[in-house]
Curated annotation (Swiss-Prot):
This is Peptide methionine sulfoxide reductase MsrB. Belongs to the MsrB Met sulfoxide reductase family. It comes from Brucella melitensis biotype 1 (strain ATCC 23456 / CCUG 17765 / NCTC 10094 / 16M). HAMAP family: MsrB. InterPro entries: Met_Sox_Rdtase_MsrB (IPR028427), Met_Sox_Rdtase_MsrB_dom (IPR002579), Mss4-like_sf (IPR011057). GO terms for biological process: protein repair; response to oxidative stress. The gene is msrB. The active site is at 118 (nucleophile).
Amino acid sequence: MKYQKSAEAIAKLSAEQYRVTQENGTERPGTGEYLYNKEPGIYVDIVSGEPLFASSDKYESHCGWPSFTKPIERANVTELTDMSHGMVRTEVRSAHGDSHLGHVFPDGPVDRGGLRYCINSASLRFVPKDRMEAEGYGDYLDQVEG
């Protein structure tokens, strides 16, 4: 499957999805659609469809945004230094869609690598496990629990 950013995909974004993914915005804590989602499946870029995170790597960090211990495929995320708002953080973007996803912090579960990928729900689309094969994500089924 080829993952890319397209004008058509951008045009389908809601105002909030556009603000987050294209203007490096952040959704308000506690408001994201996927914050409490516990269904098995994968999270893909809302713009390009590239697979980003597996439900098996999602955990409750109590930070107000969906949190993951690692990307489903390292090559699908890029990390950049973000010095906005008087802080130094590591921004996470999708590699193919170039969508702003959120940030990664070194305070995740130590036994799972020590990282916390703090991700905006507005940058994601959830693909339930029972739809993964039909939507072309069957190669990732072994990374999803259940």
